[in-house]
Regions:
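Short regulatory helix/loop adjacent to the ATP-binding pocket of P-loop NTPases
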Residues: 16-17, 101-111
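Conserved inter-motif catalytic segment of the P-loop NTP-binding fold
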Residues: 1-81
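Conserved nucleotide-binding/hydrolysis micro-motifs of P-loop NTPases
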Residues: 6-10, 18-21, 32-36, 54-57, ...
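Short glycine-/polar-rich loops that comprise or flank the Walker A/P-loop
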Residues: 24, 87-88, 110-114, 127, ...
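Substrate-engagement module of ASCE P-loop NTPases
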Residues: 70-91, 95, 111-122
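Residue-level signature of catalytic and energy-coupling elements of molecular machines
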Residues: 12, 52, 79, 94, ...
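Conserved phosphate/pyrophosphate-binding and hydrolysis machinery centered on Walker-type P-loop NTPases
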Residues: 2-6, 31, 47, 65, ...
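Conserved P-loop NTPase
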Residues: 42-49, 55-57, 120-209
Length: 210
């Protein structure tokens, strides 16, 4: 059961059709009220419940604005209790702040078993999933994925995304090994030096990109 609080059911269906993710066992609802979400749970009796996102679901039993600390705490607590009683796997999608922490109450990280962070640069197809917390295994694992027109696909060897192939060595380039969690990655570093007159460029500058 997939509960979307940010997009309508028709919008989510269009995305699912584009990446060929329609399945007869997948139930979809667009709700922002906790009571309506519980009603769908009672009707569908799912094995997996996805809430997208926790900040968009509100409860009449709690005060405060939608997405606020009080609302997020109440909604998350109620859903976790229901899922534990009915043996349902719960996946909460949440927003993060600019510093990378989970938006809303910090207690969300303490009441869940696993925290996965999905990140990537705006102009790159590469996406990383980092395990911030994992009660069932290592918390320094990193998964690499390619964001394509057909969806998000796993990348077993992401070296090709960070390096370019040359028949002969190219001046100004080198390949280094960087460690993302416990996963070593090969990355290519390219250096470009430009010589100019002081009146044209002013003081020398060092600029990095990537």
């Amino acid at each position: 059961l997939y509960i979307s609080g940010e997009e309508s059911a028709s919008q989510v269906r269009l995305r699912a059709e584009r990446i060929n993710a329609i399945d007869p066992k997948l139930w979809l609802a667009s709700e922002t009220d906790l009571g309506a979400v519980i009603t769908h749970i009672d009707e569908v009796k799912p094995q997996l419940l996805i809430i997208d996102s926790i900040q968009t679901i509100g409860s009449s039993a709690a005060d405060g604005a939608l997405g606020g600390v009080t609302q997020v705490r109440e909604v998350a607590g109620a859903l976790i209790r229901i899922c534990k009683d009915r043996d349902i796997t719960l996946l909460l999608v949440g927003h993060v702040t600019k510093d990378g922490s989970i938006a809303g109450p910090r207690m969300l990280e303490h009441i869940v078993d696993v925290v996965l962070q999905f990140e990537g640069e705006r102009h790159s197809r590469l996406r990383l999933i980092r395990a911030i917390k994992n009660r069932f295994g290592a918390s320094d694992e990193v998964g690499c994925f390619d964001l394509s027109d057909t969806g998000i696909e796993s990348v077993l060897d992401p070296t090709g995304l960070f390096t370019s192939r040359h028949a002969e060595p190219v001046p100004g380039t080198c390949v280094t090994v960087t460690l993302e969690g416990r996963r070593p990655l090969l990355a290519e570093i390219q250096a470009l030096v430009s010589q100019g007159r002081e009146n044209d460029f002013g003081n020398a500058r060092r600029v990095t990109s990537g």
